Amino acid sequence: DRINALHDSFLKAIKTYKYKNIYQGVFPVKCNQQKNVLEKIIEFGSQWNFGLEVGSKSELLIGLALLENQNSLLICNGYKDKKYIEIATLARKLGKNPIIVIEQRDEVKRIIQAVQELNATPLIGIRAKLSSKSSGRWGKSIGDNSKFGLSIPEIMLTIKELKEANLINEMKLLHFHIGSQISDIAVIKDALQEASQ
């Protein structure tokens, strides 16, 4: 019911504002790792290509095992060692759509190395460290104080390295956090404006 309401809300906004793309949601596995819950979410959300967000190797393996819809996204966050990146990269050869989200600069080198060693190309995203933040519960752990995400200079360097490695066309996602329990719409507007620059 919630997935349906969420999808309908985005669909309505897409039509209202004549947005020229689609909404594709993902469920964070860390919120509930129970197999029966994840299977129901995937089953009900399959009509909209609803996917999963994972934050560890074990969650990645869960996502790869459960997601059969080749159009569903598998967003790969969290600490990414060599094995995590290799698994996500090889999953592309199996017709899956994992997007490895670069959250730390050292992950760029590991991704490029995996591409060279495995002769496979992952989809890539970048987590930006925005200056915009909220006063909500997690407001102090985001923005310039965040331990995750790349600053603007780091993003520019990452883009340069991805171009040099012929991976820039695999860049599919810009990811950022502005906190939770946001009570002022201006915070969201500021973050979107900053992210779009």
Feature roles, as predicted:
Residues 23-196:
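Active-site-proximal beta-alpha core segment in soluble small-molecule metabolic enzymes
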Residues 1-23, 28:
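Low-complexity, highly charged intrinsically disordered N-terminal segments
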